[in-house]
Amino acid sequence: MCCDYCFQGEGVSEGIFSDIDDLKNFLQDLPTGDTLDVKFIGGEPLIYTDSIKRMIKEIRKLERTKDVHFRFGLTTNGLYFKSLIELIKEGYLDEELVKVSWDGKYSKYIRKSCYDNGFVNNAIYSIIKECPNVTVRIAIHLKNVDSIEESMLALLSRGAKSIELYYIMEYPLYRDEWFIHKCKKMFEKVARIYSFFSFRYVNWESLKYNSDKETSEASKCSHLGSHLHIDKNGDLYPCGMFVPDDNIYVTTQWKIGNLKSGIDFTKTKELEMELNKEVGCSKGCKNVNCFECPAVNLGEIGSMDKRFMQQCELKEIERKIYNKFHGVG
């Protein structure tokens, strides 16, 4: 896709995970709840649709010997929309665990001429028509902030049930007053859309569920401690952002085990101590919707508890609009 705000750099990590027997043995012994979600990530995972099908079939065999129900999802750019729809319709993927990234109706980030805006938009609309509970994620950036309202209406008019507006890591314009003003107008329009359409607006969920928490607790990463990332070599990480090969920010490995050897609890304890440090930003902030990636903070600033603090004003605007909409003080 070659998005001009992509943090991955020019390097491409080739290869896919294939140690299905080691994975099954690991999952068999792993303590779990009644349900365990498995998500395929990339790159673009739908390039390997046949491999995904094989892995899902094998993993589901564990339901015969282990009291657990597996659900499967992935994150995609949506271009392989026929493969995605097939995986959902055939019962391989759980529709609500699928996320599709989109830059909106007037995206200008497709460098390959065969992927023009019309092709990308039609791919997204095809997915929504067949699978309306898939979450469509729209990045907030300069070249689409004025058209996000139109893009959301295009999705909702086609039956979309779940939309998220997501922030780009280290995007400098989030601190510029003129861009903040643009975003404020955009968020106000989104709130008006929400009053007319029934859909899941992911941005407001953290405000809803975290309203009674302290800001420092609410803004912690929801992945760390509840997720395990398995890379193509079978190594275990707290999440995909801590894998050095895939994240240009991380310079030290935070590997916490391997499928064969299991989880390194000494390393997880070290990680826990890092994450429990007091957040290094304003003590007076009330933005329970705040979030910064600990892995990026570690790689760029040198510590997981430090903060860029460049989304603060936008998060506060979102929070105030949410409170006004819901009549919160």
Model-derived regions, located:
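Residue-level signal for well-ordered alpha-helical positions
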Residues: 6-9, 87, 242, 296
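Radical SAM enzyme [4Fe-4S]-AdoMet core and its adjacent flexible, acidic
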Residues: 15, 110-233, 241-254
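A general structural signal for short secondary-structure junctions and capping/turn motifs
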Residues: 90, 218-221, 227-230, 272-274, ...
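Flexible mid-to-C-terminal extensions adjoining Fe-S/redox cofactors in radical SAM and related proteins
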Residues: 243-329
